[in-house]
Amino acid sequence: MKGALGSPVAAAGAAMQETFGCVVANRFHQLLDDESDPFDILREAEHRRQQQLQRKRRDEAAAASGAGHRGGRSPAVASGHRPGAGGRRESQKERKSLAASGAQQPDSPGGPQPPGQKRTPRRGEQQGWNDNRGTDVVLERAERRSYREYRPYETERQADLPVEKFTDEKPVDRFDRDRPLRGRGGPRGGLRSRGRGGPGNRAFDSFDQRGKRDFERYSSNDKTNRMEDSMGGCGIRPWGSGKDTSDTEPPAPMEETSMMEECQGTLDEESAAKVPELEVEEENQVQEMTLDEWKNLQEQTRPKPEFNIRKPESTVPSKAVVIHKSRYRDDMVKEDYEDESHVFRKAANDITSQLEINFGNLPRPGRGARGSTRGGRGRMRRTENYGPRAEVVTQDVAPNPDDPEDFPALA
């Protein structure tokens, strides 16, 4: 056990347990060398806070006394010493804080400025040179343009026009007046509740609207022409018919019946003139048919092919002589005889009949005969006798169709 504990592996394991163990109290060994009393630290902090309060009161009293000397500075401030500092020189940080507090006060254009500082010109002011005094003169514009104000060339010339013209629109500031505004719509931040850009586009005459068209609106009811449009589509609705209107139309008063009777005579004359026009329109309509009907129509209109077929001669020439009469009575038997009548003549030295040709009895080598010498699966090859075999001739006689014994069912 001692050897196991004294080994470097065990020492490293113990060190890892101590280093990476979950210790709740002071895990990282902080403030172990701090032997100071926390109560002493609290007392020093309280004493320091009281000193700061006393110093602040002294500074306020010195500032009040300095203000009574007609805005003049106290000798302590002029010499660079802070009052109540106990003879300590003013640090650079305190000087920066005093300069920042002085810059935050609102200074008038004609107010006194520190001798070593220059006020930077504000936005909208022009800085010029005065020949009489030789100092910088700040000229402030009497009328400054608003941030988002849009003034094209025409509006600058007509500056005396009343401002009520642009009451509905929000002014737009354009830095590059030669180039048209990008994008679609009116000025940025317009009345967004009315679509892209709102109605502010119409007030600017020089505004490039990038092809946007302003349509004129007519005060009319969209339901006034509804019946005429729907009748063009055959009915009060697109899926209705012309007869559906009679069901939905209100009954006409009795006073109009006399007028209808008078107009009926003229309508009859017009209808008689329109009848031939309707017939012409029906003829002009495209005739619809199925695929089978179209195919039949094409076959009827298609020209039939005509072939020049030469007929065989059935007459027997007069000079023909019969050499011998046929032994067969039927033409079918004659055709079979003609097929069998082709006999090939053999030469005298033909030896094909003496050769033995066996297609189905070829010698087959044993399995694995090539690997038998290497210890494979093969067997030793048997010696086969390839000598001449006895000739077995089997002659099949074809049945005779004229013999009822060969075909008893046909008898």
From Swiss-Prot:
Expressed in adult heart, brain, liver, kidney, testis, and in various embryonic tissues, but not in adult spleen, lung or skeletal muscle. The modification Omega-N-methylarginine is found at R70. Residues 42-271, 296-318, 358-411 are annotated as: Disordered. Residues 42-62, 279-301 form a coiled coil. Pfam families: HABP4_PAI-RBP1 (PF04774), IHABP4_N (PF16174). It comes from the Eukaryota. There is a cross-link at K212, K274, K334 (Glycyl lysine isopeptide (Lys-Gly) (interchain with G-Cter in SUMO1)). GO terms for molecular function: hyaluronic acid binding; ribosome binding; RNA binding; SUMO binding; translation elongation factor binding. There is a cross-link at K212, K274, K334 (Glycyl lysine isopeptide (Lys-Gly) (interchain with G-Cter in SUMO2)). Phosphorylated by phorbol 12-myristate 13-acetate (PMA)-activated PKC isoforms at Thr-352 and Thr-373. Methylated. Methylation is decreased by phorbol 12-myristate 13-acetate (PMA)-activated PKC, in vitro. SMART domains: HABP4_PAI-RBP1. Belongs to the SERBP1-HABP4 family. The C-terminal region is necessary for nucleus and cytoplasmic localization. The N-terminal region is necessary for nucleus and nuclear bodies localization. Regions containing Arg-Gly-Gly repeats (RGG/RXR-box) may be preferentially methylated by PRMT1. This is Intracellular hyaluronan-binding protein 4. It comes from Mus musculus (Mouse).
